[in-house]
Curated annotation (Swiss-Prot):
Belongs to the ATP phosphoribosyltransferase family. Long subfamily. This is ATP phosphoribosyltransferase. The lineage of its organism: Bacteria, Pseudomonadati, Pseudomonadota, Gammaproteobacteria, Enterobacterales. Its EC number is 2.4.2.17. The gene is hisG. It comes from Salmonella typhimurium (strain LT2 / SGSC1412 / ATCC 700720). Coiled coil: none annotated. Catalyzes the condensation of ATP and 5-phosphoribose 1-diphosphate to form N'-(5'-phosphoribosyl)-ATP (PR-ATP). Has a crucial role in the pathway because the rate of histidine biosynthesis seems to be controlled primarily by regulation of HisG enzymatic activity. InterPro entries: ATP-PRT_HisG_long (IPR020621), ATP_PRibTrfase_cat (IPR013820), ATP_PRibTrfase_CS (IPR018198), ATP_PRibTrfase_HisG (IPR001348), HisG_C (IPR013115), N-reg_PII-like_a/b (IPR011322), N-reg_PII/ATP_PRibTrfase_C (IPR015867). Pfam families: HisG, HisG_C.
Amino acid sequence: MLDNTRLRIAIQKSGRLSDDSRELLARCGIKINLHTQRLIAMAENMPIDILRVRDDDIPGLVMDGVVDLGIIGENVLEEELLNRRAQGEDPRYLTLRRLDFGGCRLSLATPVDEAWDGPAALDGKRIATSYPHLLKRYLDQKGVSFKSCLLNGSVEVAPRAGLADAICDLVSTGATLEANGLREVEVIYRSKACLIQRDGEMAQSKQELIDKLLTRIQGVIQARESKYIMMHAPSERLEEVIALLPGAERPTILPLAGEQQRVAMHMVSSETLFWETMEKLKALGASSILVLPIEKMME
């Protein structure tokens, strides 16, 4: 039995978002053993319970108020939202923030030897998918009628098996499509993981914990997107050097022992530092350039 005084978070037990979700919670300082087969794991250092479930179940658990938070792909969330609306329900939830993992796209794909001149080419065709509501919404907007073939897995084999003329499925690299004689022809939905919260009144202690968790998540994401940079640079070219490195704040400038014309510069850059940027820094006279990852960050 779940304790209602503890914050309940649902994550995917196994699959595309599972490892990244667990890593995010760990980097937020939540100490929990997620290597067992138990469906409910209790945090050691916070009043938090983690429910490990199928990703399809997470939106419903949040919308029905069974859990307080859920980490889920936007594609699964939107499909469940459309499904419930089609049944006359009025599902409610709050999207707290988009996360920095789980990126994918839901796309239409057809056999490589078939011509494609837009969605109209699918009029009257049979399309295999695990996302019937997202597919219907998209093709309804295009004025295309079709027959849906609902599959919960191995969607890409449907055309070869004679089950469908085309498919609508998640794509990351496109290698699976190519292996099955298909080509991606149209992206209908782009998705990333997101953090959602149940609608309705929340106990103050839980809300304070959610606010703390959001601050930590923001810090984790900022840290992943930032780098700590150290270098020696000529004093007269500091502004040119800084212009190459967009940062959260102005850099720290320190004198160099025995050097009158050069200084040490430390800063956090909010953009990826490419080799081309480092070469430009060197051309401006910078030396001893170090680029380091950041584990945690709070502004």
